């Protein structure tokens, strides 16, 4: 590990939905951290070399037998400890205090009164003339009695212990969630713990991460050649830019143009990487193969498999032509790493598997290069900007691995894909013009394989239907449909119907997630 990783925080995950958010907040402060499951081998804690430990929230109850606990090594380590929500409850229960189940859960906005100043709370307030903070609560149980040596530092009118600390041991606990933006002073509390109490330097910045990764990649691959599957998505684009900076023309990218990409995306990828940045890119025009394989297939899962498997076959064919390649680069990011670790312990909440392209075949005897595997998505984007990629590319909306293949309901045909790509481009173009693109989390068009009656000139015509979908979400686990202005939707509809032959009707999807998923298939 480089000096960038010397000052770091360990987060033990008790299964809360907010755990990754804690890690992202600490990274934003400029400090490296990792998430381990609460039942990770405790003998590895000392070797990890953290400057402090955070115990996350979780869905369990400390009042029930068999509840998850922090390993004794946490308290024997001499390190500062910060328990959040369930983390504070287990801190209290394990150190000689008491917790109890409440009659009802407390969820949402709350106000806490700071009753004793410590290293975290000293001087903080959200209310003039009162030591009161606006926070976000999400708990059932609460601490009813603090352990020996602890002081109550905050209370609410509903619970006797909203925060507690043992300053001699540098152990702290809060019942609320400082990582959520609704807790107005949350980032200050985390910064005070990580920087002031734990003494971490803030070295985790985009520029330092790039320098560190360049050094690590050069050390890993030496003079060998590396291949990368370039999709045009954010992760693979940032990997391409980073590796090009590290090893220059020892990197070869394979870009498979499936015919299921965004409008003119193949040309844009080539212009960006091959022409503008000088990256070696092999473009494989595979649309004919994809449409042939997809003919007559309407089941979404079958379509996904065909699209994923064909990508692997084509990538395999191309990599076999590159006899000197010893390494395969991939855009694996930290949430992928956490997810596979979580599914091993069985304790962490398993998140729905996403449509990343299927795994590459076992027989490809290549070493793996994964320069983004320590990074969250927002960090990957910041790296992209730092590397000089256009902001419009780095911050664009997610696009599914199978591309338009899962946005054309039922059978996929070339004519459908071309119509849909153009309709989608019109929608995105208008969103950007109206300054609405960055206000939505994801927006796209869907091709519906049904014909609807319309009037063209004086004649009736049966033509296709395009659905528009736009959502607002923080984490893509839940989403609200975006309340786009009617005039705006009218403009988009008029353009699609007037500019695209074969479309007579445009509809807007007003379903939330749940019950609907964001994508239609």
Curated annotation (Swiss-Prot):
The active site is at residues 85, 177, 179. Residues 8-203 form the Glutamine amidotransferase type-1 domain. Signal peptide: none annotated. It catalyses: XMP + L-glutamine + ATP + H2O = GMP + L-glutamate + AMP + diphosphate + 2 H(+). Keywords: ATP-binding, Glutamine amidotransferase, GMP biosynthesis, Ligase, Nucleotide-binding, Purine biosynthesis. It comes from the Bacteria. CDD domains: GATase1_GMP_Synthase, GMP_synthase_C. Pathway: Purine metabolism; GMP biosynthesis; GMP from XMP (L-Gln route): step 1/1. It is an enzyme of class 6 (ligase). Its EC number is 6.3.5.2. Catalyzes the synthesis of GMP from XMP. HAMAP family: GMP_synthase. PANTHER family: GMP SYNTHASE [GLUTAMINE-HYDROLYZING], GMP SYNTHASE-RELATED. Homodimer. NCBIfam families: guaA_Cterm, guaA_Nterm, PRK00074.1. This is GMP synthase [glutamine-hydrolyzing]. The gene is guaA.
